[in-house]
Amino acid sequence: MLTQPILENLQKLRFYGMLTALEEQMQMPDIDKLSFEERMGLLVDREMTDREDRRLKTRLRKAKLRQQACVEDVDFRHPRKLDKRLFMSLADCRWLKEHNNTLIIGPTGVGKTYLACALAQKACREGYTALYFRLPRLLHDLSIAKADGRYDKVMMSISRTDLLVLDDWGLDKFIKEHRHDLLEILEDRHGLRSTLVTSQVPVKHWHEVVDDPTLADAILDRLVHNAYKLVLNGESMRKKRSNVQRHI
């Protein structure tokens, strides 16, 4: 049987995994020892693996994570009081299934962004979609989106993603426009999707960051009350690495 037409049709159908696997089988001298069902099973398995790999790459590309991080590489030896049991519990992504939130709080340099990106990367590996933003940049971009007509489209994209990562919460107090934008984002996601926030500011001071008592209650009610909290302390890891490099 001529295989070239089969290879061409697999290419047209975009069955790239099956195509590669069939080409590999054609080079195996003992492949005829396998039954038709066994060979077909190998082809289908390769196609499924190939498609999942491509979907994962797409999810990671769209997530735009700031750091290449994964939960397996998290350093629990650094003295920053990272609750390993809680973090590994979050790494199983059950909180995403339950539409809960996560807050990572701690001083600068203790690895908040890395931990957030590691959890987001794990979510992508588990089949969830994710989006990473530095909150100050997101709020600035939303202001621009209102001016050029993209606001509704951007907000829709944010509302639909399974995990929204908002990094650097509370670097500055929110102005009126930003308070309303943030409330709209959290209202659209409350009870439906999960949000992960990192901040140098302790949660007890977040009312001051929002800078409006009524809207602060509304925003924090949708964000904090169903959230897991990772509270970190300790010396900056960036500073520590810098000191080590200077002594090398």
Residue ranges of predicted features:
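Dynamic helix-loop-helix/coil hinge segments at AAA+ ATPase domain boundaries and subdomain interfaces
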Residues: N9-K12, G17, R61-L82
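Solvent-exposed alpha-helical segments within well-ordered globular domains of core cellular machineries
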Residues: E8, T20-E23, E38-L42, T58, ...
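Walker B motif beta-strand of ABC-family P-loop ATPases
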Residues: L163
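Interdomain "pre-motor" coupling segment immediately N-terminal to P-loop NTPase/helicase cores
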Residues: Y16-Q67
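Conserved P-loop
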Residues: L82-R160, H207
